[in-house]
From Swiss-Prot:
Family: Belongs to the jacalin lectin family.
GO molecular function terms noted in the UniProt entry: carbohydrate binding
Domain (Jacalin-type lectin) ranges: 12-157
Descriptive protein name: Galactose-specific lectin
Record PTM: N-linked carbohydrates at Asn-45 can be of complex or paucimannose type.
Keyword Repressor in record: no
Family annotation (PANTHER family): JACALIN-RELATED LECTIN 19, JACALIN-RELATED LECTIN 3
UniProt entry tagged with the keyword Glycoprotein: yes
Length: 157
């Protein structure tokens, strides 16, 4: 499916993860859906990305996945509402780096076929980028402790 939101039940692969390899946070894997409608997350301009919660599409119906919450407060919330199904993510990028000795995801940017959301957070450290020529992001995975320890994605091909 070439950037086709109606990808149905095609095969999916996991890409990533970016960030920590070992974490004391709570790992999550939302699984695969038919698309992404909304991304809610938190960031702090001094530290890193905090909680994350994604609303997916399941065959035309919104499905709000569980919030993967930070252990701490002091973040700024962001809501990215995509114009589903005509708007979809074509690139995710960000920075990983150390905060208080922990390797975490410090910044995220989501680029769609219509606009760029971000960067949110601290744009220093090691840059990562996932450009998507073919396929579609249909799920998020990662780990959240004090901050977002790492992030990865399910890609429908």
């Amino acid at each position: 499916a070439k950037n086709n939101q109606q990808s149905g039940k095609s095969q999916s692969i996991v890409v990533g993860t970016w960030g920590a390899e070992v974490t004391s946070g709570v790992a999550f894997d939302d699984g695969s859906y038919t698309g992404i409608r909304e991304i809610n997350f938190e960031y702090n301009n001094e530290t890193a990305i905090g909680s994350i919660q994604v609303t997916y599409d399941v065959d035309g119906t919104p499905f709000e996945a569980k919030k993967h919450a930070s252990f701490i407060t002091g973040f700024t919330p962001v809501k990215i509402s995509l114009d589903f199904p005509s708007e979809y993510i074509v690139e995710v990028s960000g920075y990983t780096g150390k905060v208080s000795g922990y390797l975490v995801v410090r910044s995220l940017t989501f680029k769609t076929n219509k606009e760029t959301y971000g960067p949110y957070g601290v744009t220093s450290g090691t840059h990562f980028k996932l450009p998507i020529q073919d396929g579609l992001i249909v799920g998020f995975k990662g780990s959240v402790g004090y901050w977002l320890d790492y992030i990865g994605f399910h890609l429908a091909l």
